[in-house]
UniProtKB/Swiss-Prot annotation:
Residues 1-25 form the signal peptide. The gene is GLOX1. It comes from Arabidopsis thaliana. Its EC number is 1.2.3.1. GO terms for cellular component: extracellular region. One of its GO terms (molecular function) is aldehyde oxidase activity. Glycans are attached at residues 35, 187, 297. This is Aldehyde oxidase GLOX1. InterPro entries: Gal_Oxase/kelch_b-propeller, Gal_Oxidase_central_sf, Glyoxal_oxidase_N, GO-like_E_set, Ig-like_fold, Ig_E-set. Its main location: secreted.
Length: 615
């Protein structure tokens, strides 16, 4: 072959390889909301991840504080306008860090929610055991639960815990809250529904103030609600779905009124198998104002206005996903724009769970099967929705899913074998998983630093304003027991995700709360002023997010949602001060009225959240 011919041939090969590489890169970097280009792929490859020693920073490679230059502005994807492409920040390799926050929370944290404004978390468990590790305060009378035998309960079963100091305030509860549900009203009042025995028809109210007490209405609900799910509607009212022997749903009336009307649910009837596997269903408010309801392995879209089923989704194969199968779920972050498209995408994530008969095999045969290892995702507003699954690094049942303020998802707690229930799980799963929704399929999971405390049945995890995650609970015993395989757990931990790496400290914005509104209206354009020690802060590097506090129990994070707001402009207003012009969600379909934590995020690193109310 002549030299000129060989040279021409080599040049042709180089051009061809470059073209193919470019095409592959474009596919890999595509916004993977729909994943249509990834259909037919084999099960995602598991990453082999080395987790650093999380007990201290000594011995770690010294990392200089990062000064990140913003990339050039992108045109943005999707049909919305005024959002742009959010630049991917630096890859965060720090595995996170655990700290022991409290040695004794007083009550085991079966249920948890962050109360707005006062920055205290409400923990409560069950009253049926008539025991906890903290007494009612002086001046609060003991509860007489058996007048004939003069039996009284002087223990507290509800506590308010200061998330910064760990100070505990015990509160009195009289109705049984065991396996109940909850959510926040527009003004931040906690409404707790259902429970056990005399508490099953109860609605309880706890306002968000330092000296507030529980107010209980034992006949507020039409059906007995035990293991039910409560969801917030676009107008700020509530629906309660399901529960043991309650194959129906109802709407909560204003405080002090008793509901009498029930609506039958064919979904719950059709998914009620011999092991149940449809308790604590997943209920997510879709971006169109309708409700996505998932029970066992099936799901529907329900109109809360007409009470008609609008759509049935494909079945999710592989096993059971609701109690006692107990997967965990999230409505993935909702991306908004200055001008939003007519249909705003919404993806639901369901991760882990158990085999259909796992409960029976664990309880009757003492065989603890491996939990499910898959994580499935569904675009519920797609014309042809299809579950798209990938494999987690480890099996997991009874996990908790937490949306982080930067839009990433933390999957934490649970076990590798068995199911929910008393003593029915083995091999606690100590290592959290970080799920990055916008990464390509097969690259979304990263295993983080493990805890040393088992968090199995009756555990919780919730996001905090400082970006940490509060982790507590774990009681697989029928009562408070401490000399067993998995003792009743009273220790509370905090987990710092990778974005709290000390090396990223100078990338963390600080919201100037005196220059940021405390209340906004739907569709309002408003300013968020931040301090940030970075140069050339561009719109493509910044997000403003709103995170709704979730009511968390039994692997269900009720009403958890994060909105990525449309950003109109970002400008420097002197020195390290920057002003972000953001647009509030357009309606209660996207963000039900009430309190949210407002975060500014720079290259994946969030500020401390500030409370904001949307009305």
């Amino acid at each position: 072959m002549k030299k000129s011919t060989r040279l021409l041939w080599l040049l042709s090969i180089i051009v061809l390889v470059a073209a193919v590489s470019k095409a592959v890169a474009e596919v890999d970097n595509d916004d993977d909301d729909d994943n249509t280009s990834l259909e037919g792929m084999t099960t995602a490859k598991r990453e082999t991840l080395e987790v650093e020693d999380h007990t201290s920073l000594e011995g770690m490679v010294k990392r200089e504080a990062l000064e990140v230059k913003p990339p050039k502005a992108g045109k943005g994807k999707g049909k919305g306008k005024g959002r742009g492409t959010v630049a991917a920040g630096p890859e965060m390799n720090w595995p996170g860090q655990w700290e022991l926050f409290m040695k004794n929370s007083g009550v085991s944290a079966m249920h948890a929610i962050l109360m707005p404004l006062i920055n205290k978390v409400q923990f409560y468990d069950a009253t049926i055991w008539r025991i906890s590790q903290i007494k009612l305060p002086p001046g609060v009378p003991c509860h007489v639960f058996d007048a004939k035998k003069n039996k009284v309960d002087c223990w507290a079963h509800s506590v308010l815990v200061d998330i910064n100091t760990g100070d505990i305030k015990p509160l009195a509860l009289t109705t049984d809250t065991w396996c109940s549900s909850g959510g926040l009203t527009v003004n931040g009042t906690l409404v707790s529904t259902g429970g056990f025995q005399g508490g099953a028809n109860t609605a309880r109210y706890l306002s968000t103030c330092e000296n507030c007490v529980w107010i209980e209405y034992p006949k507020a609900l039409a059906a007995r609600r035990w293991y039910s799910t409560q969801a917030t509607l676009p107008d700020g009212t509530f629906i309660v779905v399901g529960g043991r022997d309650a194959l129906n749903y109802e709407y909560i009336l204003p405080e002090g009124q008793n509901n009498k009307k029930l609506y039958d649910s064919q979904l719950l009837r059709q998914t009620d198998d011999p092991e149940e596997n449809n308790l604590y269903p997943f209920v997510w408010l879709n971006t169109d104002g309708n409700l996505f309801i998932f029970a066992n392995n099936r799901s529907i879209l329900l109109s809360p206005k007409t009470n008609k089923v609008l759509k049935e989704f494909p079945q999710l194969p592989g096993g059971a996903r609701n109690y006692p199968g107990s997967a965990s779920s999230a409505l993935l972050p909702i991306r908004l724009y200055v001008q939003n498209p007519a249909i705003i995408p919404a993806d639901v994530l369901v991760c882990g769970g158990a085999k259909q008969d796992a409960y029976f095999r664990a309880e009757r045969l003492k065989i603890y099967d491996w939990a499910l290892k898959d994580c499935a995702r569904l675009n519920i507003n797609s014309a042809k929705p299809v579950w798209k699954t990938e494999t987690m690094p480890t099996s997991r049942v009874m996990s908790d899913t937490v949306i982080l303020p930067n839009g990433e998802i933390l999957i934490i707690n649970g076990a590798k074998r068995g199911s929910s229930g008393w003593h029915l799980a083995k091999e606690p799963n100590f290592a959290p998983l970080l799920y990055k929704p916008n990464k390509p399929l097969g690259q979304r999971f990263k295993e983080l630093a493990p805890s040393t405390i088992p968090r199995v049945y009756h555990s919780i995890a919730i996001a905090l304003p400082d970006g940490k995650v509060l982790v507590g609970g774990s009681n697989t015993n029928n009562g408070y027991q401490f000399n067993v395989e998995y003792p009743t757990e009273l220790r509370i931990e905090k987990f710092s995700p990778p974005y709290l790496d000390p090396a990223l400290a100078n990338m963390r914005p600080r919201i100037v709360n005196t220059a940021t509104p405390k209340q906004i209206k739907y569709g309002q354009m408003f300013d968020v002023k931040i301090e940030l020690k970075q140069q050339n802060v561009a719109k493509e590097n910044v997000m403003v997010t709103m995170l709704a506090p979730s009511f968390t129990t039994h692997s269900v994070s009720m009403n958890m949602r994060l909105l990525m707001l449309g950003i109109n402009n970002v400008k420097n207003v002197g020195g390290d001060n920057h002003q972000i012009q953001a647009v509030a969600p357009p309606s209660g379909k996207l963000a039900p009225p009430g309190y949210y934590l407002l975060f500014a995020v720079y290259n994946g690193v969030p500020s401390v959240g500030e409370w904001i109310q949307i009305v």
